[in-house]
């Protein structure tokens, strides 16, 4: 009886394998799929990196974190007040699935009581203005104030060209600011 079942089983396997083959490729892991959609992969990676950086607990309005994604390589850029934020950002991005290599080019700003005082004064000048105060009510204010050796740089996104110019005007009016560099982008042109 067993001898009769074996040839039938072999015949079933041989006839069924061509019918199953097209479905087998659907069960392959996405990592082994050589035809992954690079654009979607890149978009997902950018979204994940941005999300992880925004979740950092000590990321403030006085820090600027940016990044660049090239394939599966991420480069962290920007300036931070606390050295721990640099290492926290690196650890958060390293933990993202799909990041093969990471370059951390985040600059830690020098400790200076004068710069701290200038940061607070520029913050008050910008976010104390009635036309710009709405940017301060967000979970992460969109105008970042970077101060290094008395030089102020504004980073982030605003809604209009007039808001960009007003923020620059308010920061320039603060005493003890040697220079103000306005790197703010307008939301409609940032897309």
Spell out what each predicted region is.
Residues 2-10, 18-191:
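N-terminal targeting leaders
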């Amino acid at each position: 009886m067993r001898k009769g079942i074996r040839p039938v089983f072999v015949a079933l396997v041989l006839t069924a394998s061509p019918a199953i083959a097209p479905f087998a490729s659907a069960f392959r892991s996405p990592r082994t799929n050589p035809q992954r959609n690079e654009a979607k992969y890149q978009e997902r990676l950018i979204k994940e990196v941005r999300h992880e950086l925004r979740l950092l607990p000590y990321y403030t309005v006085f820090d600027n974190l940016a990044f660049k994604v090239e394939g599966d390589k991420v480069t962290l850029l920007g300036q931070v007040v606390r050295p721990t934020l640099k290492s926290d950002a690196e650890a958060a991005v390293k933990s993202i699935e799909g990041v093969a290599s990471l370059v951390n080019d985040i600059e830690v700003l020098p400790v200076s009581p004068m710069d701290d005082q200038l940061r607070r004064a520029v913050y008050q000048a910008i976010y104390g203005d009635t036309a710009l105060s709405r940017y301060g009510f967000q979970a992460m204010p969109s105008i970042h104030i970077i101060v290094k050796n008395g030089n102020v740089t504004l980073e982030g996104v605003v809604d209009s060209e007039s808001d960009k110019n007003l923020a620059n005007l308010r920061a320039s009016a603060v005493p003890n600011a040697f220079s103000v560099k306005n790197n703010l982008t307008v939301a409609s042109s940032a897309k």
